[in-house]
Amino acid sequence: MKYKVITTFKPGDWDRYAKRMVQSVLDRWPKADITVYCEGQRPNFNDQRVTWWDIDKANTGLLKFREDYRNDPVAVGKLDEIPGGIRRSSRLETEGGLDAKKESYLWNAVKFSYKVSCVTHAVRTYTDYDYVIWIDDDTYTFRDIPMQFIESICPNDTLVTYLDRENDRGSNKYPECGLVCYNIKHKLVQNFINDWEKLYTSADIFELLEWHDSYVFWHLTKEYRQKHSA
Protein backbone atom coordinates (compact mmCIF):
# COMPACT_ATOMS: atom_id res chain seq x y z
CA MET A 1 0.00 0.00 0.00
CA LYS A 2 1.25 3.47 -0.89
CA TYR A 3 0.37 6.21 1.57
CA LYS A 4 1.20 9.88 2.05
CA VAL A 5 1.39 11.45 5.52
CA ILE A 6 0.52 15.15 5.72
CA THR A 7 0.66 17.74 8.47
CA THR A 8 1.04 21.45 9.11
CA PHE A 9 2.18 23.69 11.93
CA LYS A 10 1.75 27.32 12.87
CA PRO A 11 4.73 29.70 12.91
CA GLY A 12 6.84 29.11 16.00
CA ASP A 13 5.75 25.50 16.53
CA TRP A 14 8.38 23.78 14.40
CA ASP A 15 11.02 23.65 17.12
CA ARG A 16 8.38 23.35 19.82
CA TYR A 17 7.05 19.99 18.62
CA ALA A 18 6.40 19.72 14.86
CA LYS A 19 10.00 18.79 14.03
CA ARG A 20 9.82 16.00 16.59
CA MET A 21 6.57 14.75 15.07
CA VAL A 22 7.97 14.67 11.53
CA GLN A 23 11.17 12.93 12.60
CA SER A 24 9.22 10.32 14.56
CA VAL A 25 7.13 9.46 11.50
CA LEU A 26 10.28 9.15 9.38
CA ASP A 27 11.84 6.91 12.02
CA ARG A 28 8.85 4.77 12.96
CA TRP A 29 6.52 4.49 9.96
CA PRO A 30 7.43 2.04 7.17
CA LYS A 31 8.24 3.61 3.80
CA ALA A 32 7.37 7.03 5.21
CA ASP A 33 6.55 9.76 2.71
CA ILE A 34 5.54 13.13 4.16
CA THR A 35 4.28 16.46 2.89
CA VAL A 36 4.53 19.35 5.34
CA TYR A 37 2.51 22.51 4.72
CA CYS A 38 4.01 25.64 6.25
CA GLU A 39 3.52 29.39 6.45
CA GLY A 40 6.34 31.65 5.39
CA GLN A 41 9.92 30.43 5.38
CA ARG A 42 10.33 26.67 5.59
CA PRO A 43 12.52 25.25 8.34
CA ASN A 44 16.05 24.04 7.74
CA PHE A 45 15.18 20.36 7.58
CA ASN A 46 16.33 18.30 4.64
CA ASP A 47 15.21 14.76 3.98
CA GLN A 48 14.36 13.33 0.58
CA ARG A 49 11.25 11.74 2.07
CA VAL A 50 9.80 15.14 2.99
CA THR A 51 8.06 17.50 0.55
CA TRP A 52 7.29 21.11 1.52
CA TRP A 53 4.34 23.24 0.41
CA ASP A 54 3.46 26.86 1.06
CA ILE A 55 0.06 26.49 2.71
CA ASP A 56 -1.27 29.74 1.21
CA LYS A 57 -0.64 28.34 -2.27
CA ALA A 58 -2.25 24.99 -1.51
CA ASN A 59 -5.83 26.24 -1.83
CA THR A 60 -6.54 29.75 -3.12
CA GLY A 61 -10.22 29.55 -2.20
CA LEU A 62 -9.42 28.93 1.43
CA LEU A 63 -6.72 31.60 1.36
CA LYS A 64 -9.40 34.07 0.27
CA PHE A 65 -11.64 32.81 3.09
CA ARG A 66 -8.91 33.62 5.61
CA GLU A 67 -8.27 37.02 4.07
CA ASP A 68 -12.00 37.82 4.11
CA TYR A 69 -12.62 36.83 7.73
CA ARG A 70 -9.37 37.03 9.69
CA ASN A 71 -10.24 40.58 10.84
CA ASP A 72 -13.73 39.64 12.00
CA PRO A 73 -13.43 38.88 15.73
CA VAL A 74 -16.34 36.43 15.74
CA ALA A 75 -14.80 34.35 12.93
CA VAL A 76 -11.67 33.84 15.02
CA GLY A 77 -13.47 32.78 18.18
CA LYS A 78 -13.95 36.17 19.87
CA LEU A 79 -17.18 37.73 21.11
CA ASP A 80 -16.82 41.28 19.78
CA GLU A 81 -19.25 41.81 16.91
CA ILE A 82 -18.63 44.26 14.08
CA PRO A 83 -21.28 45.85 11.83
CA GLY A 84 -22.14 43.50 8.99
CA GLY A 85 -19.92 40.83 10.48
CA ILE A 86 -20.36 37.17 11.30
CA ARG A 87 -22.64 36.02 14.11
CA ARG A 88 -22.69 32.73 15.96
CA SER A 89 -25.70 30.49 15.40
CA SER A 90 -28.88 31.40 17.28
CA ARG A 91 -29.22 27.67 17.97
CA LEU A 92 -26.57 28.05 20.66
CA GLU A 93 -29.26 29.48 22.94
CA THR A 94 -30.85 26.03 23.19
CA GLU A 95 -28.17 23.64 21.89
CA GLY A 96 -24.94 25.27 23.04
CA GLY A 97 -22.75 23.98 25.84
CA LEU A 98 -20.89 25.78 28.61
CA ASP A 99 -18.69 27.65 26.13
CA ALA A 100 -21.55 29.04 24.05
CA LYS A 101 -21.14 32.58 25.41
CA LYS A 102 -17.37 32.55 25.80
CA GLU A 103 -14.38 33.26 23.60
CA SER A 104 -13.30 29.86 22.34
CA TYR A 105 -11.41 27.97 19.64
CA LEU A 106 -14.72 26.21 18.96
CA TRP A 107 -15.64 29.19 16.76
CA ASN A 108 -12.23 29.96 15.27
CA ALA A 109 -13.14 29.14 11.68
CA VAL A 110 -10.10 30.93 10.31
CA LYS A 111 -7.62 28.89 12.34
CA PHE A 112 -9.03 25.52 11.34
CA SER A 113 -9.31 26.40 7.66
CA TYR A 114 -5.57 25.79 7.40
CA LYS A 115 -6.07 22.07 7.94
CA VAL A 116 -8.71 21.99 5.20
CA SER A 117 -6.25 23.68 2.82
CA CYS A 118 -3.81 20.84 3.43
CA VAL A 119 -6.27 17.98 3.07
CA THR A 120 -7.98 19.30 -0.06
CA HIS A 121 -4.64 19.93 -1.75
CA ALA A 122 -3.22 16.54 -0.83
CA VAL A 123 -6.27 14.54 -1.89
CA ARG A 124 -6.35 16.35 -5.24
CA THR A 125 -2.61 16.16 -5.80
CA TYR A 126 -1.51 12.72 -4.62
CA THR A 127 -3.88 10.65 -6.73
CA ASP A 128 -1.24 8.01 -7.40
CA TYR A 129 -1.33 7.08 -3.71
CA ASP A 130 -3.81 4.76 -2.02
CA TYR A 131 -4.31 6.87 1.10
CA VAL A 132 -3.54 10.32 2.45
CA ILE A 133 -3.09 10.22 6.23
CA TRP A 134 -3.42 13.41 8.23
CA ILE A 135 -1.49 13.51 11.54
CA ASP A 136 -1.52 16.50 13.92
CA ASP A 137 1.85 18.16 14.39
CA ASP A 138 1.76 17.87 18.19
CA THR A 139 1.75 14.07 18.13
CA TYR A 140 4.69 11.70 18.53
CA THR A 141 5.15 8.15 17.23
CA PHE A 142 6.98 6.33 20.03
CA ARG A 143 7.17 2.81 18.60
CA ASP A 144 7.54 1.17 15.20
CA ILE A 145 4.30 1.05 13.18
CA PRO A 146 3.84 -2.23 11.26
CA MET A 147 2.60 -1.91 7.69
CA GLN A 148 -0.06 -4.45 8.64
CA PHE A 149 -1.52 -1.94 11.10
CA ILE A 150 -1.56 0.85 8.52
CA GLU A 151 -3.34 -1.44 6.07
CA SER A 152 -5.88 -2.35 8.75
CA ILE A 153 -6.92 1.29 9.25
CA CYS A 154 -6.88 2.02 5.52
CA PRO A 155 -9.31 -0.51 4.00
CA ASN A 156 -10.17 -0.47 0.31
CA ASP A 157 -13.90 0.14 0.78
CA THR A 158 -13.88 2.97 3.36
CA LEU A 159 -14.09 6.66 2.44
CA VAL A 160 -12.40 7.96 5.60
CA THR A 161 -11.03 6.42 8.78
CA TYR A 162 -10.98 8.49 11.97
CA LEU A 163 -10.96 8.21 15.76
CA ASP A 164 -14.64 7.93 16.61
CA ARG A 165 -15.80 9.01 20.06
CA GLU A 166 -19.39 10.00 19.35
CA ASN A 167 -21.55 9.89 22.47
CA ASP A 168 -23.70 12.20 24.55
CA ARG A 169 -21.04 13.40 26.99
CA GLY A 170 -19.99 16.98 26.28
CA SER A 171 -17.39 17.61 23.60
CA ASN A 172 -16.99 13.89 22.96
CA LYS A 173 -19.98 14.00 20.66
CA TYR A 174 -17.68 14.63 17.69
CA PRO A 175 -14.55 12.82 16.43
CA GLU A 176 -10.95 13.30 17.44
CA CYS A 177 -9.28 14.41 14.21
CA GLY A 178 -5.63 14.13 15.16
CA LEU A 179 -5.36 11.17 12.79
CA VAL A 180 -7.62 10.86 9.74
CA CYS A 181 -7.09 8.57 6.73
CA TYR A 182 -8.53 9.50 3.32
CA ASN A 183 -9.04 6.77 0.74
CA ILE A 184 -7.78 8.30 -2.51
CA LYS A 185 -9.27 5.47 -4.58
CA HIS A 186 -12.78 5.84 -3.17
CA LYS A 187 -15.30 7.11 -5.72
CA LEU A 188 -16.62 9.77 -3.32
CA VAL A 189 -13.38 11.16 -1.92
CA GLN A 190 -13.10 14.08 -4.36
CA ASN A 191 -16.75 14.99 -3.76
CA PHE A 192 -16.10 14.83 -0.03
CA ILE A 193 -13.25 17.33 -0.07
CA ASN A 194 -15.09 19.56 -2.56
CA ASP A 195 -18.05 19.74 -0.18
CA TRP A 196 -15.71 20.39 2.74
CA GLU A 197 -14.05 23.24 0.87
CA LYS A 198 -17.41 24.67 -0.19
CA LEU A 199 -18.51 25.06 3.42
CA TYR A 200 -15.79 27.71 3.69
CA THR A 201 -15.84 29.35 0.27
CA SER A 202 -19.64 29.75 0.44
CA ALA A 203 -19.46 30.86 4.11
CA ASP A 204 -22.00 28.14 4.93
CA ILE A 205 -19.72 27.07 7.77
CA PHE A 206 -21.09 29.98 9.77
CA GLU A 207 -24.52 28.35 9.77
CA LEU A 208 -23.17 25.39 11.76
CA LEU A 209 -23.37 25.21 15.52
CA GLU A 210 -19.57 25.15 15.89
CA TRP A 211 -16.77 25.96 13.43
CA HIS A 212 -13.69 23.98 14.51
CA ASP A 213 -12.22 21.09 12.52
CA SER A 214 -13.75 18.18 14.42
CA TYR A 215 -17.27 19.59 14.37
CA VAL A 216 -17.19 20.49 10.66
CA PHE A 217 -15.68 17.10 9.77
CA TRP A 218 -18.35 15.38 11.89
CA HIS A 219 -21.09 17.36 10.15
CA LEU A 220 -19.78 16.27 6.76
CA THR A 221 -19.37 12.59 7.65
CA LYS A 222 -22.94 12.48 8.97
CA GLU A 223 -24.19 13.94 5.69
CA TYR A 224 -22.28 11.34 3.69
CA ARG A 225 -23.63 8.49 5.81
CA GLN A 226 -27.18 9.71 5.24
CA LYS A 227 -26.89 10.51 1.53
CA HIS A 228 -24.39 7.93 0.33
CA SER A 229 -24.22 5.28 3.09
CA ALA A 230 -20.47 6.03 3.10
Predicted segments with their positions:
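Catalytic core and acceptor-binding pocket of nucleotide-sugar-dependent glycosyltransferases
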Residues: 179-230
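A structural signal for well-ordered alpha-helical segments within the folded catalytic domains
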Residues: 16-19, 113-117, 211-219
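Short catalytic/ligand-binding loop motif for oxyanion handling, primarily in non-cytosolic enzymes
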Residues: 43-45, 61, 141-144, 149-150, ...
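N-terminal anchoring/stem segment of glycosyltransferases
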Residues: 1-101, 124-129, 184
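Short acidic-hydrophobic catalytic motif
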Residues: 104
